[in-house]
């Protein structure tokens, strides 16, 4: 695999298993990764451009400070994936498990997350533009310091989010009536039975 500022381009990998490797600062350009397993692999500082991940598994992996541009992450398992301070631009996550993942301090633009799990994931202090969630599990998502204004969460499971004391992250978020009732308990409201 690429090690330190290496370049992997115009290729495909099927069923490859990589463990305890460092591909830091490598560039992956126009690459298909299908059914691959990564265990303890450090992709810190890597560039992923026009990369498609299909059915891949990431265990104890880090993409800290990585740049993902025009990437598709489809039907992957990546619980606990570290994307701290990553830059994501034109990225699709579909039917992917990102539970416990850390996307804190990431810069996100034109990212769609569909049918995916982000249970107890961290998205603290994220700079987000054109972020779309649909039909995803966002239970206990930590959005401390991340504004959700204009982001439609109405088709998602969005319960017990981690927020700042004044709940400012929720200002302008689009939620369903049922979600609004659930979130109102954070403010101490008690809903009367009719």
Task: Enumerate the language-model features and the residues they cover.
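Tandem repeat scaffolds
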Residues: 1-194
């Amino acid at each position: 695999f690429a090690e330190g500022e290496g370049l992997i381009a115009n290729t495909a990998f099927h069923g490859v298993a990589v463990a305890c490797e460092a591909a830091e600062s490598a560039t992956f350009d126009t690459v298909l990764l299908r059914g691959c397993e990564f265990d303890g692999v450090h992709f810190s500082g890597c560039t992923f451009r026009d990369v498609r991940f299909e059915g891949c598994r990431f265990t104890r992996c880090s993409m800290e400070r990585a740049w993902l541009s025009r990437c598709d992450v489809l039907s992957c398992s990546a619980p606990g994936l570290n994307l701290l301070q990553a830059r994501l631009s034109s990225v699709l996550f579909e039917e992917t498990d990102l539970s416990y993942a850390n996307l804190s301090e990431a810069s996100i633009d034109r990212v769609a997350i569909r049918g995916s799990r982000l249970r107890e994931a961290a998205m603290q202090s994220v700079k987000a533009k054109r972020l779309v969630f649909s039909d995803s599990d966002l239970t206990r998502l930590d959005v401390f310091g991340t504004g959700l204004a204009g982001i439609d969460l109405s088709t998602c499971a969005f319960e017990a989010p981690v927020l700042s004391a004044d709940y400012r992250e929720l200002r302008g978020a689009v939620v369903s009536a049922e979600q609004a009732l659930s979130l109102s308990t954070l403010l101490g409201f008690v809903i009367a039975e009719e």
